[in-house]
Amino acid sequence: MIIKNASHEITAVKPIQYPVTGFPEIAFVGRSNVGKSSIINTLVNRKSLARVGSTPGKTRQINFFDVNGEFYLVDLPGYGFANVSKEMKASWQNLIETYLYSRKENFLKMVVMLVDIRHSPSKDDIIMYQWLKGFGLDTLIIANKVDKISRGQIHVRINDIRKVLQLDDAEKVIPFSAENRFGLEKVLAEFDNVLSIPGEEQKD
């Protein structure tokens, strides 16, 4: 996949505001400090398409980004942010749940769940992953911040993530770095696989 252009399409807080173009969608979820916005910017080769907040937990809406005029990357609110009220957490959960329910049948092709490769998945990560699988959604795990560990530790950390999340052999975990683009081509290849956009040829 070659990403030629990307732009912010719309910010939504309820289904009536979602895009109506019919484009397929790939959604991103992750803890509020995992670098979700930075990963999206790296994938589309833009420095500030998705806004990187100075305070974790900044994303409180759903942001749709048009990629190549063919599909959307969807930035969902971060979870696991401690310094917010229970009411706010419930509001964000409802925002995510409403999106998943309304888009999973016709638009949502994959959910990308982001974790920090340096640490074992948290209780919130485990709950989120089980929740996504309960929806029957195709889920890809991206283990970000691989630039913060040695090459020799990558395999060890990936195995730990697989064990904690109880992944089967068919479920993929891709080590990634938003800083140096490590793993970029593998992630884009996964996007090719699920999108099957006419005229696109999968590249190694």
Swiss-Prot record:
GO terms for biological process: division septum assembly. Keywords: Cell cycle, Cell division, GTP-binding, Magnesium, Metal-binding, Nucleotide-binding, Septation. GO terms for molecular function: GTP binding; metal ion binding. GO terms for cellular component: cytosol. HAMAP family: GTPase_EngB. Necessary for normal cell division and for the maintenance of normal septation. PANTHER family: ENGB-TYPE G DOMAIN-CONTAINING PROTEIN (PTHR11649:SF13), MSS1/TRME-RELATED GTP-BINDING PROTEIN (PTHR11649). This is Probable GTP-binding protein EngB. It comes from Ruminiclostridium cellulolyticum (strain ATCC 35319 / DSM 5812 / JCM 6584 / H10). The lineage of its organism: Bacteria, Bacillati, Bacillota, Clostridia, Eubacteriales.
